[in-house]
Amino acid sequence: QKISVEGRIGSVRWTVDRADSTLFYGLAMDGKKGIILDNFSLRGSSGLSLRGIPQQMLRQFNEQRPYDLIILEYGLNVATERGRNYDNYQKGLLTSIEHLKNCFPQASILLLSVGDRDYKTEDGELRTMPGVKNLIRYQQNIAAESGIAFWNMFEAMGGEGSMANLVHAKPSMANYDYTHINFRGGKHLAGLLYETLIYGKEQYDRRRAYE
């Protein structure tokens, strides 16, 4: 359901006749201006579970909230230290992306690669897990095969060993598991992604001007 209200809202109340027959997926209270962002956090997910969301439900979401851009960022927990073969992951994520395309036909889709993830070698040195680099190659292929945009977050972070640099930054921008960024790190990477998107838009506008 969608309700439009003019002016300021002080409070909102919903009343249902039977609680057992009512299911709330969420609440959005957006204005008519600016950028609207919905964040669907699926912690620990590889992104393959998106295939299981019924098409009818997603299409109903699209009727109420027709997205311009869908950003996918999964895979950190898929990577293993020496992982080389991610064929099943590639096949599954391609299916998930096609599923989203069918349900949100107007939306562009951007796939973010996994970031750096470090481990300690036998000599005690911090190095990027080889499996991370292999997974990123698979993710690049996924984006190319499905015809969607791709952003290499690993390279944006600084490439090889960059997670350790974020951990040891002052103040720190990542956790001492050398896997997860913190809020400061998230803000830092968000700024880099924003700059990339704006630069891409500027280049697109310049090309269009010469057509």
List the predicted regions and their residue ranges:
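Loop/turn elements at helix/coil->beta-strand transitions in domains of secreted/extracellular proteins
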Residues: I35-I36, R65-I70, F104-I109, E145-A149
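Conserved, well-ordered alpha-helix/loop/beta-strand core segments that scaffold catalytic motifs
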Residues: L69-G75, L94-N102, S108-S113, R117
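Catalytic His-Asp segment of secreted/periplasmic serine-dependent ester chemistry enzymes
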Residues: Q55, D116-E211
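Generic beta-strand/beta-sheet core signal
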Residues: F40, L72-E73, L112, L135, ...
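Alpha-helical scaffolding segments of alpha/beta enzyme cores, especially the outer helices
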Residues: N88-K91, T95-N102, N134-N141
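Conserved SGNH/GDSL esterase-like catalytic core that processes O-acyl groups on lipids
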Residues: Q1-G92, H180
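A generic secondary-structure signal
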Residues: R59-F61, H99-L100, T196
